[in-house]
Amino acid sequence: MALQLLIGNKNYSSWSMRPWVLMKQLGLPFEEHKLRFDFAPDSPFRRAVAAVSPAGCVPVLVDTADGFAVWDSLAIVEALHERFPAAGVWPSDPQARARARSIVCEIHAGFGALRSHCPMNIEAQLPEVGARVFAEQAEVRLNLQRIEAAWADALRSSGGPYLFGAFSAADAFFAPVCMRVLTYALPVSDTSRRYIDHVKRTPAVAAWITDALAEADFIVEDEPHRQQR
């Protein structure tokens, strides 16, 4: 079984980060195929992604043995759980697993205000933007409040250090949120801060951050708050 994961720029692509971090941290075998974001109609990025995914978005997981592709980060996670049932993609306890899926679906489908006003940008340091957004955007405050409540509930039930004890898809899905809190210096509780620090030190997350900082790329479409690096 030879799996290839197509991803976008590590500095910006929060959806790519999720399955990559999960697979790397759990030791699942895969080959990374990184494509530089370029959203022009006939760009190499669009052509390469369209060749394997009708959705035209990253991430995409391809089984190179037969070319079968799975797209969308949550669909990829479920495919990995089926392929590697003992790897720990989801918590082993049925109730914990159901709760993990519930909060992952929340982040997958919701929190649009946080995503829109504070897009992932690992390399940037934007505390002034974060302070302004937090003060002016009530929906961002509500998004962050709900995220912190979900974290606190999971950590209280599991005892930590990850949301459900051991690292799982839930932590992989919230890793980009942790990056946003750090980039924009968003105010969070001490419990959330400890969790964010632990996620940041997770080997797979640390490796992703290192790669993101090394990209030295500037994608205008992903930079609503800066004119240059």
Specify the residue positions occupied by each region the protein language model found.
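GST-like domain detector, emphasizing the conserved glutathione-binding G-site
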Residues: 1-134
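Short, hydrophobic secondary-structure boundary micro-motifs
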Residues: 87-92, 115-117, 159-164, 206-211
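Active-site-flanking alpha-helical
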Residues: 81, 177-178, 209
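Short, contiguous strand/loop micro-motifs
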Residues: 5-7, 33, 165, 182-183, ...
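Acidic/histidine-enriched, glycine/proline-rich intrinsically disordered or flexible terminal extensions
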Residues: 212-229
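GST-like fold's C-terminal all-alpha helical module
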Residues: 107, 111-201
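Conserved beta-strand edge residues that scaffold enzyme active sites
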Residues: 36-38, 195, 213
